[in-house]
Amino acid sequence: MEIKQTRIFKSTYKRLFLKQRKSVDHAIRLIIENPSIGEQKKSDLSEVFVYKFKVDAQLYLLAYTFDPVTLTLIMLGVHENFYRALKRMPYLKK
């Protein structure tokens, strides 16, 4: 499975500490094994899945889309304003 990253995901990932990166890497491995592990969103975000995981006591959300060939990592962040920012992503505009 080919893994693609959006520019926003890359820049957020780059700013993480090592322990946070390891948790994100583990979450990505879980998603690769079972892409439907995340919760599929509804309405205007219907093609997006969000996987929730904890780093220490902080809840992180990882938004992604997938098809049989590609897994696209869209956005990573904490819950605060996550969905608002996700809706504004140019990647999801049609």
Residue ranges of model-derived segments:
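Residue-level detector of beta-strand structural context in well-folded domains
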Residues: 1, 49-51, 62
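Conserved short hydrophobic interaction patches
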Residues: 27-30, 79
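A short, surface-exposed loop/turn module that caps and links secondary-structure elements
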Residues: 29-56
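Arg/Lys-rich, positively charged N-terminal/basic patches that mediate binding to nucleic acids
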Residues: 1-27
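Alpha-helix boundary recognition
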Residues: 14, 32-33, 87
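Enriched for short, Lys/Arg-rich terminal
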Residues: 55-61, 65-94
